[in-house]
Structures are given as structure tokens and as C-alpha cells.
């Protein structure tokens, strides 16, 4: 693999020499940082099993190497990236996999370790969505996830990735992470705080990542991290699990933040060791039981992961002073909900008791039941998924609901050929050789729902959202 030149401030190198355990080679660290990062993907098991994904992609010539800490994760090598970018493959467009750095799969693995099965989870800094979608897959789209993102522009990206992956148990919020301890005290079974950090571990992806680095900035960032982990710990219920992670390497933003929390709440914080998280985890294990992953250990990004348990309740913070405002939705009455469910089933849309119907004007939404306890406590940017819009002739079913809840085995499902599917993803109407019988058609490809279409004569009218339309080559088999 080609080398690239990474910028290292002298003070950073001094700090790394002090932080690195004696069992590791500093020369190996420098050499690893100069190698470009291996690409990796995570199979979206909400859509397809790992075995079926491997069978589907076997003809493509992809080399997939298992990632030890994530059974659905793989390092990927492919020869045709220039001809067909990985993010433009139809398997990616239909949500069968997520392009995710291998190290960033570690925090969710830690969150669900030892049989942990939380029902209400918060992802404090969620965008672009790799960990939120990984959490949703581990929860099998059940329970509820509060995915928060401070950056307004990233909230849209977060929603797009959640929608593409067919996820319906998520509520999105747009706050600074400091608010949650006061706003929703002790309400979550598990919390992931993948904290904003100095990014020292990402130099293999971004050789200039340390251009603005300084020891002083590390101190400033660590102060913010202490505020965030304190807020998250207040929002965690007694007995719950908190995973703290960063993509940086200094101790000030990692071990020291966790030790500060333990010193602040000595009787309420328990460190849960991660040495048995996966075979070979002990190579990155700290004396506290955290994983401090230097890039040469597993040939990946630098990363840090700690797992904590809240052993008992702590005093509440002062109530927040902001006003949430009126909640513009109302629950749909049982009789009407039954009629809506029946109409949805006719086009292949079904959902279980984890979701409940709510209405706003002519809009119908599905909200995760587990998030209802938070209504009135925080203001949501987006909650659940939009199911349909009502009109005089019935319902206009929404694309995100189709991706999340349509069954490809529905009687009105119509499987496209590769050529037809390529037209569909480009936003064009499709003219199948043998037109379907039904007027309202669930369009599928590779046995995956990719949208709804209305049959008009010999053509299928395309309803693929304009913002998702793609140009260029889309199919690995044609590359």
C-alpha cells in the first residue's frame, strides 16, 4: 500500500512517546500512521444476513476480511473503485451495508457486550450515523434510540443515513450534549458518548489532521469532554451502561476523562473491563480495563473505548430553563389506526407493536413507543418515520416507510432487472418488458424494497426522491 506524508508536531510526538506502552514500538506507530487507512464496511443486518451478503457480492471479486470485534464488519479491497465508487453501488444505495471505519465499530460492540440488551439508548454525538445505525441493527429496530447531533448541517446527513438503512426506532434531536443530564435524568438504559476530540487517530485518513494541534487545545477539549460525560452520566439510569469513546490518542482526552468521572462519583461509577471483548483485545488493554488502540496494533485508526456502569442514582441537576413548546402530534385512535394498518398492508407495509401511529394535520407518522416518555422533555428535530400523507383518494405512502417496513414478498412486489433498477436510481420511469398487474407496485431489486411505483400503461412512474437520484455507473456487475 502506498505511503503518504503525515504532519506531526514535535510536541505531539513527545506526548505519544510518553503515552505509548513499552510493549509497543514507536517506530511501528510512525510507520502505521504513514500508511493509508484500510477501507471497511459493516453489513446492515436489518436488511440482509451476513451470509446472504457474502453470497450476493461473491461474483464481484471483493476481498472481504472479517473485523475481529464486529461479526458483520469487514475490511474491503476492490479493484474498480475509480470506475465505480463503493458509495455508488446499488448495495450501498439500498442500505445493505454502511461504509464505516473499523475502529468506530468498537464502541457499539462494547455497548452490547456481555449480553447487554438496552431498550432505550442515547447516542450523544450521532452524525453521520455509523454508530446509530449499528446500534439500531443490534436492537433489531426495536426499543428506541435518541440520536443527538449538535451541528445543524449534520442532522440532515444523519437522517439520510438512518432512512437509507431502513431504521424506524430513532428520534433525532439537535442540542449541545450538556443539556441531557438535566433534561432527561436517569432515563436511558445505555448511552454512547463518542466525544468530540482532537482527532489524533485519524491521520491515516487525513494526513493534515494535526495542522492545528496543540497541547493547549487538548486541555480545552478535555474540559468539554468532562462536561459531556457528566451530563451523559446524569441521563443514565442506575444499572445502565455508558460507553465513552474518541478517535484520539492522548491520555488527557481519554483515560483522564474517565478517571475524573470516577473521582467525581466514586461510589456510583464502575469500570467494566474490555479485555474479553474480542480475541486479541488485551493487546490494547489499559490498567483500568479500557481499550487504547494505537494504529499499529490492529492496522486501523487510533481509537479509545471505555465502558462504565452506573451502580446507583446520583443527585439530580437543576431543571432546564428552556421551553420545549407544544408537541404538534396526536396519537391516532385505535379504530382509525386499524384502517390505516389494513391499507398499508395492501401495499406491503407492516410494523409491530414497537411503533405507534401519530398524526399531524394530514401526515401520518410511526413513533417508537419507547421514546414517548421523552415527549415534553426535549424538542425533537425528527421523530420516528413519516408513514403517509392522507388525501381524498387514500394515502400517499412515503419512501422512508417503504425502505423500513415493506415486505419484498408482498403480492404486489415487482422485481426489477439490473438495467431497470439502474433507471430507477437515476430517477427515470421504468418500462418493464412484462408490466405488473397491479396499479400500485412495490418495486424491488435484489429482493430489497427500493420504492413504490404507479403503473401507467406500460410504464412504472418513478417515485424515487429527487434528492437521492444518482448519476454514473451504479452496478458492480457492470464495472
Swiss-Prot record:
Listed under catalytic activity are:
cytidine(1407) in 16S rRNA + S-adenosyl-L-methionine = 5-methylcytidine(1407) in 16S rRNA + S-adenosyl-L-homocysteine + H(+)
Gene3D superfamilies, A to Z: 3.10.450.720, Vaccinia Virus protein VP39
Q: Which residues does UniProt mark as catalytic? A: 247 (nucleophile)
* Keywords, alphabetical: Cytoplasm, Methyltransferase, RNA-binding, rRNA processing, S-adenosyl-L-methionine, Transferase
- Where is the major localization of this protein? cytoplasm
List ligand-binding residues for S-adenosyl-L-methionine. Answer: 125-131, 149, 177, 194
Instruction: List GO terms (cellular component aspect).
Output: cytoplasm
Q: Where in the cell is it found?
A: Cytoplasm
What is one Gene Ontology biological process annotated in the Swiss-Prot or TrEMBL record?
A: rRNA base methylation
Q: Its Enzyme Commission number? A: 2.1.1.178
Q: Which SUPFAM superfamilies match?
A: S-adenosyl-L-methionine-dependent methyltransferases
Q: Which PROSITE patterns match?
A: NOL1_NOP2_SUN (PS01153), SAM_MT_RSMB_NOP (PS51686)
InterPro entries in the record = Methyltr_RsmF_N, MeTrfase_RsmB-F_NOP2_cat, MeTrfase_RsmB-F_NOP2_dom, Nol1_Nop2_Fmu_2, Nop2p, RCMT, rRNA_ssu_MeTfrase_F, RsmB/NOL1/NOP2-like_CS
Molecular function terms in GO for this entry? RNA binding; rRNA (cytosine-C5-)-methyltransferase activity
Q: What does this protein do?
A: Specifically methylates the cytosine at position 1407 (m5C1407) of 16S rRNA.
**Family matches, as HAMAP family:** 16SrRNA_methyltr_F
What family is this?
Belongs to the class I-like SAM-binding methyltransferase superfamily. RsmB/NOP family.
**Which PANTHER family has this protein been placed in?**
28S RRNA (CYTOSINE(4447)-C(5))-METHYLTRANSFERASE-RELATED (PTHR22807:SF30), NOP2 YEAST -RELATED NOL1/NOP2/FMU SUN DOMAIN-CONTAINING (PTHR22807)
Could you tell me what this protein is called?
Putative ribosomal RNA small subunit methyltransferase F
Organism, by scientific name, is: Shigella flexneri
Name of the gene this protein is made from: rsmF
